[in-house]
Amino acid sequence: MDLFEYQAKELFAKHNVPTTPGRVTDSAEDAKAIATEIGKPVMVKAQVKVGGRGKAGGVKYAATPDDAFTHAQNILGLDIKGHVVKKLLVAEASDIAEEYYISFLLDRSNRTYLAMCSVEGGMEIEEVAATKPDRLAKVPVNAVKGVDLAFAREIAEKGHLPAEVLDAAAVTIQKLWEVFTKEDATLVEVNPLVRTPDDQILALDGKVTLDANADFRQEGHKEFEDKDATDPLELKAKENDLNYVKLDGEVGIIGNGAGLVMSTLDVVAYAGEKHGGVKPANFLDIGGGASAEVMANGLDVILNDSQVKSVFVNVFGGITSCDAVANGIVKALEILGDEANKPLVVRLDGNNVDEGRRILAEANHPLVVQAETMDSGADKAAELANK
């Protein structure tokens, strides 16, 4: 889960990472009130989960509360790379002597943690990596040893930070490591990490991605969910513990196992080329369980997608046999009743496939069409979606 900047800074404050005071708002009047309360020049910053805010006009300096009001009016509703600004962070402006970069992330290719640090902050880090690779330090972090003050200082030194700020930077870097580990993050990034004229180190921006797999032990992270921005179907699927991702297509997909579902997406997309260009409408993996309740929840999510014209259920029976899947489909259709109003193409294969097909045939539901193979099932689903 990606956080907004103001949410990242809430975590920073929790772990004593120094930053500038400010508050989030969704109105220009409130932005003016916050600026008045701060009593100093402020930055008015669009809260969107995408980079390039400054270039898009989403970050403005306000010398007075009236300036904050004007900038807030202009920024609210702004479209930044497809993200409409609904919230603003009004934070105290800071004098900047130098800008640095620091991040912690997962290095999946090397199966370790990685610290990245550079004296060249305030610009896109990809640009630094491309044009000044010697100015960007990439330091592997031992998961067991972690980051103590000495190692944090070493990271700062390798990033070419000036000697006079190494100690102060090390303290902040260690605290950012604490955010990374204690909050179960997969990314913690500060760009820029600034040095003020009086040699303070401040995190002026923050980007944090939290690992959703750790939600069970991070109760406090629920408050960070942006339900307004989350697709309602994805929210509904999450509430029912379904692995669902909405796509822009017409054929709903249900499968068991991520690999099979991904293959199904490809086959449906290929079949759709000869049926009006229809595409997969979603990724939905029901995993190893195909009970009536799980199947009903999955179908309920997909059938509530107005773009869906047909559904392709593609299941390979393993631990969960095909007869159990077939019974789940039949019972799910009974549970949904009139809500089940779009054709279902069902392809079963694997453990107890003959019995599964017999159950579906005897049920003789008017919406269910059986397919022998994945290719024929994808073709039929694409054909039905194009009618």
UniProtKB/Swiss-Prot annotation:
Quaternary structure, from the entry: Heterotetramer of two alpha and two beta subunits.
Molecular-function GO terms, alphabetical: ATP binding; magnesium ion binding; succinate-CoA ligase (ADP-forming) activity; succinate-CoA ligase (GDP-forming) activity
Keywords from the UniProt entry: ATP-binding, Ligase, Magnesium, Metal-binding, Nucleotide-binding, Tricarboxylic acid cycle
Amino acids binding ATP: 45, 52-54, 94, 99
PROSITE patterns: ATP_GRASP, SUCCINYL_COA_LIG_3
Binding site for substrate: 256, 318-320
GO cellular component, one term: cytosol
Listed name of the protein: Succinate--CoA ligase [ADP-forming] subunit beta
Family annotation (SUPFAM superfamilies): Glutathione synthetase ATP-binding domain-like, Succinyl-CoA synthetase domains
Segments forming domain ATP-grasp: 9-236
Cofactor note: Binds 1 Mg(2+) ion per subunit.
A single GO BP: tricarboxylic acid cycle
S-S bonds: none
Originating organism: Mycolicibacterium gilvum (strain PYR-GCK) (Mycobacterium gilvum (strain PYR-GCK))
Reaction equation(s) it catalyzes: succinate + ATP + CoA = succinyl-CoA + ADP + phosphate; GTP + succinate + CoA = succinyl-CoA + GDP + phosphate
Residues reported in the UniProt entry to bind Mg(2+): 191, 205
UniProt pathway annotation: Carbohydrate metabolism; tricarboxylic acid cycle; succinate from succinyl-CoA (ligase route): step 1/1
Enzyme class: ligase
